Design a protein with these regions (language model features):
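C-terminal motif of bacterial Sec signal peptides marking the signal peptidase cleavage site
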Residues: 24-28
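Intrinsic low-complexity, intrinsically disordered segments enriched in polar/basic residues
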Residues: 2-4, 41
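Exported/periplasmic ABC-transporter solute-binding proteins
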Residues: 30-259
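Bacterial N-terminal signal peptides that target proteins for export
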Residues: 4-16
């Protein structure tokens, strides 16, 4: 874990970013006409590609534009997001999936753990989007899941974090298609914590956090966990301001968020 200024940041899992549908994920989110034409010529389909992007503030978007070079940086270090202005904006993972599922010409991006039979993941450099390929390094498009808290964490919130990082919590993360950070974690030891805990942030992290909440409340009925879905930036702001106990981010944290 990392300790910086106001927040404690813990990485509790990782996942792969999967482009959806069988068109070129690399070209899909740029605004280069050369890339767009290459995608069309390399595909058996024809016609315009409907780009679906996550909203500003989304950790998924931030990770995607960085990993694929869609975000550029000038000599002064100023960053520019070159996602095409024609992109359809999906403000949650579920909306992204629905948009891509309902449009055979659409291409978007989501976490591997969110994938379903309704969409198809794009191979990257010939590698399929699987947990095994992320672990062996052949599928290189992956990013961390992080949680952040203020230093003065309640006993109930700390106990829930302990559960997430225990062997029990890490198994839930693995069972749901994500990459655990500690395959040698110790079993969860139930304590006497009680109270309410609010977890807020990334819609990509929310599904697995809901699974962790359900399992934790099954072994500790004295703690009530509320999971609020928004985006990574909102989650980090809420944790910093103390309006939630634990913030969720599906990307690396920015310097401005860690102190």
């Amino acid at each position: 874990s990392i300790m910086k200024a106001m927040n404690k940041i813990k990485r509790f899992g990782a996942m792969s970013l999967a482009g959806m549908l069988l068109m070129g994920a690399l070209a899909g989110c740029g605004n280069s006409s050369e890339n767009d034409s290459k995608t069309d010529s390399d595909s058996s389909a024809s016609g315009a590609i409907d780009v679906v992007s996550r909203e500003d503030g989304s950790g998924t978007r931030g990770a995607f534009i960085e990993l694929f070079g869609i975000e550029t940086k000038d000599a002064s270090g100023n960053k520019t997001d070159n996602t095409t202005s024609d992109a359809i904006i999906a403000n949650q993972t579920e909306v992204m999936m629905q948009n891509v599922q309902g449009d055979e010409n659409a291409i978007g991006y989501a976490s591997l753990g969110s994938m379903s039979d309704s969409v198809k993941a794009v191979k990257i450099d010939g590698a399929e989007a699987t947990t095994e390929n992320v672990l062996n390094g052949s599928y290189k498009i992956s990013r961390p899941f992080n949680v952040a808290t203020k230093s003065d964490l309640s006993a109930a919130a700390q106990d829930f974090l302990n559960y997430i990082l225990s062997a029990d919590g890490q198994k839930i993360i693995s069972d749901n298609g994500y990459i655990p950070v500690d395959d040698k974690a110790q079993a969860y030891q139930a304590g006497s914590a009680s109270g309410d805990v609010t977890v807020a942030g990334s819609s990509s992290v929310t599904p697995v956090m809901e699974k962790l909440k359900e399992a934790y409340e099954g072994v500790n009925k004295n703690v009530k966990i509320t999971v609020q879905e928004s985006d990574s930036t909102t989650g980090m702001t809420s944790a910093s301001e103390g309006t939630c106990d634990i913030g969720m981010a599906s990307r690396e944290l920015k310097d401005s968020e860690t102190g």
